[in-house]
Every structure is written in C-alpha cells, then in structure tokens.
C-alpha cells in the first residue's frame, strides 16, 4: 500500500555504518538489456541480461560485502521475475515499485563499432512510488545512492526531496542521463541541481557534463561545488578521475586501467 511521506516520522534514524537492518539504499533503474552482436558471417545474435545503473551499483556494493537494498521499478512479468531472482540469489533486499507498464528493456545494437541503445516505453515510464516500505528503508539508511533516476519528473523529484532526510550527510548522486530516457532535459538539469545543492557526494562523468551541461568536465565540476555539493568525483572513463571537495581537497589520478590491485 502506498504511504504518505508526510505521515512518516521526520526523526532521523540513520546509523553511522550500514547493517543488514539499515543497509545502504540504492534508488534508480533495474531493466533487462538485450545485446545484439554481429557474427563473423554478418548475421546477428542476441543475448539478454539484467542491468540498469542502480542495479549495477547495488551489485557492486554487494560484492564488496556492503549491506545494500535496491528500490526500482519493475513489472509483474517474466523480466521482473528474472530481476527479483537475480537479486535474491545474491542476498540483496529488493523493495520494488510494480509498474503496469512492465519491466523496462534496452536494446543494444552495433553501430560503427559502438553499441547504440534504445529504450522501450516501460523503461521510459519507470517511476518510484515511495511507499511505506521504501520510505522506511530510506529513512534508516546511512547512505542513499541515486543512479538512473527520473529527475525530469516533477513528482519524482519532490518525493525524493521529502524522503531523504539530512541529504548533506547521506545523499550520493549519479545523474547517469541516457539518450532516449531523459524526456525533458531542462527539467532534469534543474531538478538534479536542486539535489546537488544539498548532497554529500556527486559523481559526474565527461559524458554527463557534455549531455547535461554542454560544458567541459572541469567546468561542470566547479559548478557542482558552487551549487553546494560537499564532494565531487569527476571521471573520464579509464583515462582517470578527479576528487574535489569544498574543504579544498583536489586529488587527480590518470589512467585507471594502469592501477594495480
């Protein structure tokens, strides 16, 4: 049953470290990707796998041994069953919003050597209900990570603002905009920046900076700090990244692919 966020206690309940009872909460997308590949003889083969930026973040945290829960939109359909089973197999708590539109799908097709992604209507219609179970998870979480969220939806934006108490201590943002999923780029940027202004941590890639702000990554990084973000991680694929914060720390590392384990 969908609850009302204002009915929930506003008393902060987050603990300092994630535990099974108060895991890190990841909010965003969980979809199935169909990968089409060109065979040597010129034909196409396809395979599918569970994916989505929020699901991928969740899996990465689980592999590191971090207690984590996922909040995402899926359908009551075979793809939704597949996602549930995948998370259950890895012992990850899942608090879904079940969508009448179904579970989102992305189709990856080869184009000039690079994958070209298209998203179906269900992926574009992904929405989080912020029901009682989801809000309780968010309120108890030591950290709340956002990736692949529909920032261009005004209601989603407002519900997230209401749900995350003390964002300056807990909110971790990754816009991860995708062509074909962002329906209103102006609203997406405006609402994302509203969350950045009070976030603990914001991640931006060079692709994010170009797609959202039409600006170089360094410029967009400075803008995030000016908006109020406490920490910003700016990355350029395997070319490296830069961590800066409002206290004056500025650390840069080039060529991630050369890092030793």
Sequence positions of predicted segments:
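Glycine-rich phosphate/adenosyl-contacting loop at the front of the ribokinase-like
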Residues: 2-90, 258-260
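Hydrophobic anchor at the start of a short beta-strand
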Residues: 67-68, 94, 169-171, 232
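Conserved N-terminal subdomain of the carbohydrate kinase-like
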Residues: 34, 66-148
